[in-house]
Amino acid sequence: MTLHFYTVGYEGTTVPDFLQAVQAAGVRQLVDIRALPLSRRPGFSKSALRSALEEVGIAYLHLRALGTPADGREAARKGRQRDLERIYRLQLELPEAIAATAQLRQLAGEAPTALLCFEREPAGCHRSLWLRWEAPEATVTDLFA
């Protein structure tokens, strides 16, 4: 099975622009891999985002186990990439993260799937780490809203 993932961050965008970007790419399901699916940006917290996506025919799923733990988020904010990678690698070894990874790979084989987190630039986000480590054979398209 050939896997293809889209990635998208909502940093600096609006819900309408975000929806336009994922719709234009043909995304059919969006998987939120934030540990905490909350946002100060209007419309990007879990319930509001799910509703907005479902209104345009895109399914929403939150996989908390693939999120970055608090100490990893702190390392990322402070630019400590090696610490972020070490912390996130340990997170992905947890049984619930292993199960979530299997679920995400299955979903991506069924329909065009986007990974969501906050950061606009994928290189600075754990979604790129997940893809590099857990789906290295996948093709990846980074979306920018």
Identify what each model region corresponds to.
Residues 1-145:
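Residues lining hydrophobic/aromatic ligand-binding pockets adjacent to catalytic sites
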